Amino acid sequence: MARHRKFFDPNNENPFEISRSKVENFVRCPACFWLDKVKGIKFPSMPPFNINSNTDKLLKRDFDAVRGIKTHPILEKNGLGHLIPFKHDDLDKWTSSLHFGAKGYFHSVHEETNILLGGGLDDVLINEHTGELHIVDFKSTSNQSKEPKPVNLYGDWKMSYKRQMDMYIWIMRRLGFEVNRVGYF
């Protein structure tokens, strides 16, 4: 089956691929999204923050050291010792956002719209008491204050984090996994 991506073609019967970031583009500016996906006029973008991808890589490497064996010390320290980094043969594919539409990667088709939604997971934890999975999304922040406030998910711009988590939980459930509605950032 040929992949249907980049530009929407109403005559193409294959599911149209939309990444998590493209969903956010639609939420921010539906007209810009339409121009991008139908007319090929690119949505304005920001340069990537290399610190974010480096943080993700370092945290994943740290979790890989105990994956499928035991909890990570930072989880234990924060009262989450019952959560263990999840080991699965497809995890490397699921964490590859650049190939999400390819066979076996992290996506699911929404049948009513024939849209293939996907992205790249940061990580997954398994609850050793319930067997449920918890989606993890690593976020980098800079708080230079002398008295930093705890990071939270309040604020309009953080709604995209919630949508991302909801989408990834939905996809994992569609892949047949028992997934807890609680995810971790």
Question: Where are these predicted regions, by residue range?
Answer:
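Mg2+/Mn2+-dependent nuclease catalytic core
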Residues: 99-185
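Metal-dependent nuclease catalytic cores that hydrolyze phosphodiester bonds in DNA/RNA
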Residues: 1-132
